[in-house]
Amino acid sequence: MNLLAKTRKLNTMLQQEASTHVDFKVMADRLSEVMESNTFIVSRRGKLLGIAIKQQIENARIRGFLEERQFPEDYTKKLFNVTETTANIAIDSEHTAFPIDNRDMFETSKTTIVPIIGGGERLGTLVLGRMLEDFNEEDLVLAEYGATVVGMEILREKAHEAEDKARKKAVVQMAINSLSYSELEAIEHIFEELDGNEGLLVASKIADRVGITRSVIVNALRKLESAGVIESRSLGMKGTYIKILNDNFLYELERIKSN
């Protein structure tokens, strides 16, 4: 299969996987299939976003990295110091993706490192490994193309995360703004009592201590629940179980209290 055919195959496979959720495992599988190599999509912090093993590496330390889906910090830093595509790295190099403690088994191995760049910043690293064959120029073209696509997907996921965070923040602000003064006061006391993201409380006890009616507490909780900020469930005489669903809620509540 020539370069054009491989590029088209890779492009088709990656486009088929395009969705609102970025699946880096699938992307690694697709790259591994076309590149015929072990493939690791590594984040800036060394997290293994996607792994595809074409040629098994029987080594306990490497197996541990794969199970934890995390490269060691020192190796991650070494990857980050590689600022341009570096091909056919030997087993003796500190950048090899193969276990140097089994040097004899992997003496013909080749590692290729491709920085993942997007939006003008380093987003991660694409690491490829083969047991025997060198990576040729066509392989490197494909690898750099693959790294570009992965970079675009990382940026897309970051954008989705930012949108989700902004939406959650807006929902919390709207929910809190819908509360009356007495309801807001009740909510502040409730979550001081809760001391965490979930727990059990007795509304009548809080109402008596703060000097408000139980109905104010019930109405306040109902407003937050209808906005999807919290989940509540009556446990009868035991009280009411409350769980915070929106992780922006406590921050916004604290911000309002401090103003």
UniProtKB/Swiss-Prot annotation:
A single GO molecular-function term is:
DNA binding
Alphabetically sorted, this entry's keywords are: Cytoplasm, DNA-binding, Repressor, Transcription, Transcription regulation
Question: Tell me, which GO biological process terms does this entry list?
Answer: negative regulation of DNA-templated transcription
Task: Provide the protein's localization.
Answer: Cytoplasm
Region (GAF domain) residue spans: 1-155
Its chief place of residence is cytoplasm
The source's domain of life comes to Bacteria
Can you cite an annotated GO cellular component? cytoplasm
Q: What residue ranges are annotated as transmembrane? A: none
Q: Does the keyword Transcription regulation apply?
A: yes
What ranges are recorded for DNA binding?
203-222
Keyword Membrane carried by entry: no
Q: Which NCBIfam families does the record match to this protein?
A: codY_Gpos, PRK04158.1
**What family does the database annotate?**
Belongs to the CodY family.
Q: What does this protein do?
A: DNA-binding global transcriptional regulator which is involved in the adaptive response to starvation and acts by directly or indirectly controlling the expression of numerous genes in response to nutrient availability. During rapid exponential growth, CodY is highly active and represses genes whose products allow adaptation to nutrient depletion.
State the protein's name: Global transcriptional regulator CodY
Name of the gene encoding the protein in the UniProt record:
codY
